[in-house]
Design a protein with these regions (language model features):
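Acidic, Ser/Thr/Gly/Pro-rich intrinsically disordered interaction regions
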Residues: 1-255
Length: 255
């Protein structure tokens, strides 16, 4: 027998499988040695000058597509949760969606326009605690924004290399002659980051997505706990775990 919110669980499980696929795709990209360095020597009347160049291969389009799949499943898990909470309350789940809005002043109206008010006062109180608006819970709002972005344009993550090659500057006779020592394509510390246009500058792709998946999982669990109590309106507002109140830090910290 299926338990409450099992459809949402399925979407979260799919998001986790896509995360594994994403890590594999990024691993293949890094293994391909996408960064190369070279020294350009320029001869002129005043002598020689040298330019150092770094060439970075683009990240595979598959990476952006997989990210879109992860976000789509997370948003679907939230919408399925909203609809099932309405059904549990004995109401019609037609046109029911998880509410997102710009600010707290818009939240009550958005709850009604997305028909989530049919889920009952406790479910609404739980949702309000989540602060699903831009100035409230940034991590939750990011899921909404990325879902819209994925529908409108391709998601193209950026690659960064934090390493530089070892360069020998002089020949044995003292002549300046910069040369890269060893393989100019290896090793490199490569990080895959969110593109600037989605508002997540400076955040590593995989750790941030892992946080978002866990956040949605926690939200579903909170609503499941409410559903198991029978949605009684006289029990007072639900209490959320502290981890549901977390937000994305300014930058994802290094592991």
């Amino acid at each position: 027998m299926k338990h409450a919110l099992s459809a949402s669980d399925t979407k979260i499980q799919r998001a986790r499988r896509h995360l594994v696929e994403l890590e594999s795709e990024i691993g293949d990209f890094v293994a391909s040695r996408p960064v190369k360095f070279n020294v350009e020597t320029i001869e002129n009347s005043g002598g020689r000058s040298f330019n150092f160049h770094m060439h970075m291969a683009p990240v595979s389009d598959n990476v952006g597509a997989i990210v879109g799949d992860i976000i789509h499943n997370l948003r679907a898990a939230l919408d399925l949760t909203a609809a099932e909470m309405v059904r549990i309350a004995g109401e019609d789940d037609k046109e029911v969606y998880f509410p997102f809005c710009e600010n707290v002043e818009d939240l009550d109206g958005t709850i009604k326009s997305r028909n989530f008010d049919r889920a009952g006062t406790e479910a609404v109180a739980l949702l309000q605690t989540l602060k699903p608006y831009r100035t409230g819970n940034l991590a939750l709002q990011v899921i909404h924004d990325l879902e819209i972005h994925d529908k409108q344009r391709a998601f193209i993550p950026s690659a960064m290399s934090a390493a530089s090659p070892i360069v020998r500057m002089w020949d044995d006779d003292g002549t300046i002659n910069p040369q890269i020592i060893g393989d100019p394509a290896w090793p490199n510390d490569i990080k895959i980051m969110f593109p600037n246009e989605v508002g997540l500058q400076g955040r590593k792709l995989v750790p941030t997505l892992q946080e978002l998946v866990q956040l949605v999982d926690d939200i579903v669990e909170a609503f499941r706990g409410l559903a198991s109590r029978g949605l009684k309106d006289d029990d007072g507002p639900p209490q959320l775990l502290g981890l549901l109140k977390r937000n994305l830090p300014p930058r994802v910290t290094e592991a």
